[in-house]
Amino acid sequence: MANIKSQKKRVLTNEKAHKRNVAVKSSLKTAVRATREAIAAGDKAAAEAAYKVAAQKLDKAAGAGVIHKNQAANRKSGLAVAINAL
């Protein structure tokens, strides 16, 4: 544990941010997984609906700095290509 007062505060802040980032990443993975499952099932309408949710979550995560904006773009692009191939 840190001895400096400001560093003790930063430890608490970092823990809070870590929990928030883990929660965002978890919901992001769930949304992407739902899209991939709809694609695997061959249901284009469901895949497009799931993609809309996943794309929104990817953009929000990138905006919050949880993931890099290029990673969000690459994931959205990969999902879109898979949906268009249906």
UniProtKB/Swiss-Prot annotation:
**Keywords, in A-Z order:** Ribonucleoprotein, Ribosomal protein, RNA-binding, rRNA-binding
Instruction: Name one matching Pfam family.
Output: Ribosomal_S20p
**GO biological process terms held by the UniProt record:** translation
Could you give one GO CC term from the UniProt record? small ribosomal subunit
Q: Which InterPro entries match?
A: Ribosomal_bS20, Ribosomal_bS20_sf
Q: Which GO terms describe its molecular function?
A: small ribosomal subunit rRNA binding; structural constituent of ribosome
Family recorded in the similarity comment: Belongs to the bacterial ribosomal protein bS20 family.
Q: What is this protein for, i.e. what is its function?
A: Binds directly to 16S ribosomal RNA.
What is the name attached to this protein's record?
Answer: Small ribosomal subunit protein bS20
The gene that this protein is the product of is rpsT
